[in-house]
Curated annotation (Swiss-Prot):
Principal cellular location given in the protein's record: cytoplasm
GO biological process, one term: S-adenosylmethionine cycle
Record text on cofactor binding: Binds 1 NAD(+) per subunit.
Organism: Prochlorococcus marinus (strain MIT 9215)
Protein name as catalogued: Adenosylhomocysteinase
Lineage: Bacteria, Bacillati, Cyanobacteriota, Cyanophyceae, Synechococcales
Length: 472
């Protein structure tokens, strides 16, 4: 059951699965708040100041319980918010219901179609006679929609040749919008002060735009805050990957041979999680530095094509395109589990499997029969497995990430004149502040430098303690 509640614009006030889930969602939000000390500290610090008063934020990020705490923090700090999920499978319907019940516009339900996904992304950008002035993005879809739509206003032929199902839905949604408002995208784009981007893939898009000198507004790269990438990407994946695989399949991980493709922070956490439950873990990498790191951690570094027939569990974590191809898929052993923990769904060539028999076992779990007669288990249709088949990262680690997001929104909204159309990272002292806000919760006690010690290493007693070049 999908419920929408219309207001006096062409955009409904919310689109969710079931408003009756709001009480359940509220109970889980209350629990999550106790595990998100960073966000709660920002509420206390800025409650009276309201540094986001006047901010109109279009949010495109997984609509989970943890995100609900983020949304309500933004609102408590003065912002107006409209929200959609950045993945068709990642919404927790009770979280969306709780946000809708509070009167915050939200457009998200688990299991959206691609057409619905792009419609909802349009909804967060459409404020009627008003306009959003900030974007909070995860993967760059909201930002990318404005940029592509603006191009289509001038030359509709950019929408002529979609290369996949996703682009077909995206291009169709832009054409439909242009039929009723031919200047929608450029008008909204001109009102955007800036964007804060959550994830590796979205940040890569922003840097590409910067390189092409086509970034339309300033951007803060939240992903590369140390307290995001070295915590969310690493420790979050270390817990949520195996959670999702076990919820989806009930498989015994101990003794299985697993291949993690990509050994960045996400891959490192994924490999640790599988090894922690007794899997024999191998790693595939293109980067010699990451490959050497994997080898020094005791993982076998292999080529996919050399081991594909021997692997029980495949995990892609690269942010790249078709790292598991049709040629790899058809060689897989019977009952091999195939999943992705990178942001987009194109790391695995799922489209090539469409011609083979599919049997849906349960939501986001499919049995696919290969020409060899072997069956593989595909999770979340190749999309983010930890949010498609489970509930994503734990609240505590997401508090790190989302505290960075709130600080980035405050910084960009209040100091826009200091930022050019480039990509920035938050300064080191804010990164350290985020870490400080989370220490008490886990009983950690900081040692304090003496003045003499601080002078000896040429830092302030209060920090920052490391140079911008330090890699942690």
């Amino acid at each position: 059951m999908v419920i929408s509640n219309s207001i006096k614009t062409s955009v409904p006030h919310f689109v969710i699965s079931d408003i009756s889930l709001s009480d359940f969602g509220r109970k889980e939000i209350k629990i999550a708040e106790t595990e998100m000390p960073g966000l709660m500290a920002l509420r206390d610090k800025y409650q009276s100041e309201k540094p986001l008063k006047g901010a109109k934020i279009a949010g495109s990020l997984h609509m989970t319980i943890q995100t609900a705490v983020l949304i309500e923090t933004l609102v408590d700090l003065g912002a107006q918010v409209k929200w959609a999920s950045c993945n068709i499978f990642s919404t927790q319907d009770h979280a969306a219901a709780a946000i809708a019940d509070r009167g915050i516009p939200v457009f998200a339900k688990k299991g959206e179609t691609l057409d619905e996904y792009w419609q909802y992304t349009h909804y967060i950008l459409d404020w009627g006679s008003d306009s959003p002035n900030m974007i909070l993005d995860d993967g760059g879809d909201a930002t990318g929609l404005l940029i592509l739509g603006s191009k289509a206003e001038k030359d509709l032929s950019v929408l002529d040749n979609p290369s996949n199902e996703e682009e077909t839905a995206l291009f169709s949604s832009i054409k439909s919008k242009l039929q009723v408002d031919g200047s929608f995208y450029s008008r909204i784009k001109s009102n955007i002060i800036g964007v804060t981007e959550e994830t590796t893939t979205g940040v890569a898009r922003l840097y590409q735009l910067q390189k092409q000198k086509s970034l339309p507004f300033p951007a803060i790269n939240v992903n590369d805050s140390v307290t995001k990438s070295k915590f969310d990407n690493l420790y979050g994946c270390r817990e949520s990957l195996v959670d999702s695989i076990k919820r989806a399949t009930d498989v015994m991980i101990a003794g299985k041979v697993a291949l993690v493709i990509g050994f960045g922070d996400v891959g490192k956490g994924s490999a640790q999680s599988l090894r922690g439950l007794g899997a024999i873990v191998k790693v595939a990498e293109v980067d010699p530095i990451c490959a050497l790191q994997a080898a020094m951690e005791g993982y076998s570094v292999v080529r996919l094509e050399d081991v594909v027939e021997d692997i029980d569990i495949f995990v892609t974590a690269t942010g790249n395109y078709q790292v598991i191809t049709k040629e790899n898929l058809v060689k897989m052993k019977n009952e091999a589990i195939v999943c992705n923990i990178g942001h987009f769904d194109n790391e695995i060539d799922v489209a090539s499997l469409k011609n083979y028999p599919w049997e849906n076992i349960k939501p986001q779990v499919d049995h696919i029969t290969l020409p060899s007669g072997n069956k593989i288990i595909l999770l979340a249709e190749g999309r983010l497995v930890n949010l498609g088949c489970a509930t994503g990262h734990p609240s505590f680690v997401m508090s790190n990430s989302f505290t960075n997001q709130v600080l980035a929104q405050i910084e960009l909204f209040n100091k826009s004149e200091q930022y050019a159309k480039e990509v920035y990272v938050l300064p080191k002292h804010l990164d350290e502040m985020v870490a400080r806000l989370h220490l008490d919760k886990i009983g950690a006690k900081l040692t304090k430098l003496t003045k003499e010690q601080a002078d000896y290493i040429n830092v302030s007693v209060e920090g920052p303690y490391k140079s911008e070049l330090y890699r942690y």
